[in-house]
A protein has these predicted regions:
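ATP-binding N-terminal substructure of ATP-dependent carboxylate-amine bond-forming enzymes
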Residues: 1-94
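A conserved helix-loop-beta module that forms one wall/lid of the active-site cleft
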Residues: 90-152
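Generic C-terminus detector
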Residues: 366-370, 374-420
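Internal nucleotide-binding/catalytic subdomain
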Residues: 152-292
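Short, charged, surface-exposed secondary-structure boundary motifs
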Residues: 38-40, 55, 98-104, 216-217
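Active-site "cap" helix and flanking loop/linker of ATP-utilizing ligase/carboxylase catalytic domains
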Residues: 245-267, 284-356, 369
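Short acidic-hydrophobic, aromatic-tinged amphipathic segments that line or gate anion-handling sites
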Residues: 43-49, 121-125, 156
Length: 420
């Protein structure tokens, strides 16, 4: 079958890499892709937010299955249009994507479903939000309501920081994402993520992961889209996974069905775990990035069967075969990220890296210029390895990085520390 993946990051590179291992797959097309994806797939240029352009590509390239990687096309309703045209598509509807695109919506769903999460209040204007912060005190978590590329969440350790965050959100720092704000209690515990596939009725867990959102070692500095991840997450043992599904995910899915917007796709539950009890931090309605990379490294080609069954509503027949392995990904980013950074810097040494089922350098913000691979984004490379233990996987990843010649790049040197 011919498959079209929408997206251009390390997530999409890892999905393409895994899907290509399945004998059902004939050709993989990716739009817009990147330099690394272009080495293993056909990259095509279309506006992935424009459903008409996506439909045209589906017909032109005889596509049998469309997989939507990032959140923006989901928020734009591309999945709805494709499904209405009878195209087999993996990705939730625009309505059910609100579990990610609106923090306020998610909180209301959790309230109705009785799913444990942080206490909160939402505000549509500045002054009441400022007054609330002064009343509550710190620490607090301030969230822009809409999509902000993973950077719209501020953990405010003092009142002044919280006040500044709210002023920046309402002042337009996050564009349309900042038309309203959610202010939450600061939850204590350890954060980790559970990924499940949902076909509207059946819930299938497909792995756990822990990412590293802060830019600096020791989880310091600014929030980013993610500087690395590893799987499995030790804190998410089977007991905690079962509690998460029973107390959080299943009640959420029932509430979505009751509202006439059943969820189908992948649901990423960001969790805070304390004393083996999970509370919901956030939902994402697509594979995380960089969490997807470690999941794909462990799942391989069987993921295509699971994605197809999800899209067809036949998830009840699927079983995931797990190896007793560990995977880690270390993100190499452009100096200055998550602030301003230089584009067009040349990356050497990539051709000499090992590449097999245990070692892959997934590309994110790269492109090809004059025959050379150059950086054109903030997060640029995802050095990903798999081994029998986490420490072995970690050593392999950092050994691979030593062979990459990119003076303008940087990376955290402690990815995986919580699991060791």
């Amino acid at each position: 079958m011919n498959i079209l993946i929408l997206g251009s990051g390390g997530r999409e590179h890892s999905l393409a890499w895994a899907i290509k291992q399945n004998p059902k797959c004939d050709n993989v097309f990716v739009s817009p892709g990147n330099a690394g994806i272009g080495q293993i797939c056909n990259c095509i240029e279309i506006n992935i937010l424009d459903a008409k352009q996506v439909l045209k590509a589906v017909k032109e390239y005889s596509i049998d299955f469309v997989l939507i990687g990032p959140e923006a096309p989901l928020a734009a309703g591309v999945s709805d249009v494709l499904k209405n045209e009878g195209i087999l598509t993996f990705g939730p509807s625009k309505a059910s994507s609100q579990l990610e695109t609106s923090k306020k919506f998610t909180k209301e769903i959790c309230d109705a479903a009785g799913a444990p999460t942080a206490e909160y209040k939402s505000f549509a204007s500045l002054e009441p939000a400022l007054a609330y912060i002064k009343t509550k005190g710190a620490p607090l978590v301030v969230k822009a309501d809409g999509l902000a590329a993973g950077k719209g969440v501020i953990v405010a350790t003092d009142i002044e920081m919280a006040l500044t965050a709210v002023r920046e959100i309402f002042g337009g720092s996050f564009g349309d994402a900042g038309t309203s704000v959610v202010i939450e209690e600061f939850m204590e515990g350890e954060e980790a993520s559970l990924f499940v596939l949902v076909d509207g009725k059946t819930i299938l867990p497909i792995g756990t992961a822990q990412d590293h959102k802060r830019v600096g070692e020791g989880d310091t500095g600014l929030n980013t889209g993610g500087m690395g991840a590893y799987s499995p997450a030790p804190i998410l043992d089977q007991s905690v996974v079962n509690k998460t599904i029973d107390r959080i995910i299943r009640p959420t899915m029932y509430e979505m069905m009751d509202r006439g917007m059943p969820f189908t796709g992948v649901l990423y539950a960001g969790l805070m775990i304390k004393d083996s009890n999970p509370r919901l931090v956030e939902y994402n309605v697509r594979f995380g990035d960089p969490e997807c990379q470690v999941l794909m490294m462990r799942l391989g080609g069987q993921i295509l069967d699971a994605l197809l069954s999800t899209a067809k509503g036949e998830l009840g027949d699927v079983k995931i075969n797990w190896a007793d392995d560990h995977s880690i990904t270390v993100v190499m980013a452009s100096s200055g990220y998550p602030g301003s950074y230089e584009k067009g810097t040349v990356i050497n040494g990539l051709d000499d890296l090992p590449s097999d089922s245990n070692f892959v350098c997934f590309h994110a913000g790269t492109e090809k210029q004059d025959g050379k691979i150059v950086a054109n984004g903030g997060r640029v490379l995802n050095v990903t390895t798999r081994a029998n233990t986490l420490i072995e996987a970690q050593r392999s990843a950092y050994q691979m990085i030593k062979n990459i010649d990119w003076p303008q790049g940087f990376y955290r040197k402690d990815i995986g520390w919580r699991g060791l």
